[in-house]
Amino acid sequence: MTKKKALNPLPYLASIVFLPWGISLSFNKSMEPWVTNWWNTSQSETFLNDIQEKNILEGFIKLEELFLLDEMIKEYPETHIQKLRIGIHKETIQLVRMHNQDHIHIILHFSTNITCFAILSAYSILGNEELIALNSWVQEFLYNLSDTIKAFSILLLTDLCIGFHSPHAWELMIGSFYKDFGFVQNDKIISGLVSTFPVILDTILKYWIFHYLNRVSPSLVVIYHSLNE
C-alpha cells in the first residue's frame, strides 16, 4: 500500500502538466471553425484596442497613399491603372482578413486559458489526496538532496528570475500575457512591472532565507552565501 501511494504522485504530476495542455489544444482546434464562422457572420460591432487600431490606421494610410498615387498617374495607360486598382483592392481584403484573424486568435487564446484554469482548479479540488501525496514526495526528494545542490539550485533559480538578464525574460512573459488575453500592451506599465517584480521576489527570497532556511539548515545558508559571493 505504501509503495502504491509513493508511485501515485508521478502520474498525477504528469497529468497536471500534460492533460490541461492537451485538452486545451483539442478545445482550441475544435472551437476555431465555430469562432471563425461566428466572427465573420454574426459580429456586427468592431472592438479595437490601441495597438490594433494603430495597425489598422497604418494599413489604411498606406492604401490612401496608393489612391493618391492613382490620382497622380491618370495619364498612364488604362491597363496599368486597372492593375493598380486591383492591387489596392487585394490589399484592402488582406487588411480586413488580418484584422479578423487577430480577433479570432484573441478569443481562442482567452478561451484556452480559461479552460486550463478550470481544469487545474478541478484538479486542486478533486485531487486533494494526490496533492498531499505529491507534496510529501517533493519534500522527501528535496530533503535527500545535499546542501550544495540545494544552494546551487536556489542560486540558479534566483539568477534566472531576478538576475542581470531577467528583465528581458519578464518583458517577454508579460508581453505574452497581454497578447493572450487581448489587453492593451502599454510599454510604461510593462516597464513598471519589470522594474517591480524582481525587487519584490528578491525581498521575499531574502526574508525566506533569513527566516526559514537559517533556522532549518544553517549550513545551506552558509553554502548559498559562499556561492553567491
From Swiss-Prot:
GO terms for molecular function: antiporter activity; proton transmembrane transporter activity. It is found in: Plastid, Chloroplast inner membrane. The chain crosses the membrane at residues 7-27, 106-126, 189-209. It is a multi-pass membrane protein. Keywords: Antiport, Chloroplast, Hydrogen ion transport, Ion transport, Membrane, Plastid, Plastid inner membrane, Potassium, Potassium transport, Transmembrane, Transmembrane helix, Transport. It comes from the Eukaryota. It catalyses: K(+)(in) + H(+)(out) = K(+)(out) + H(+)(in). GO terms for cellular component: chloroplast inner membrane. Its main location: plastid. One of its GO terms (biological process) is potassium ion transport. Pfam families: CemA (PF03040). InterPro entries: CemA (IPR004282). Contributes to K(+)/H(+) antiport activity by supporting proton efflux to control proton extrusion and homeostasis in chloroplasts in a light-dependent manner to modulate photosynthesis. Prevents excessive induction of non-photochemical quenching (NPQ) under continuous-light conditions. Indirectly promotes efficient inorganic carbon uptake into chloroplasts. Belongs to the CemA family. This is Potassium/proton antiporter CemA. It comes from Nuphar advena (Common spatterdock).
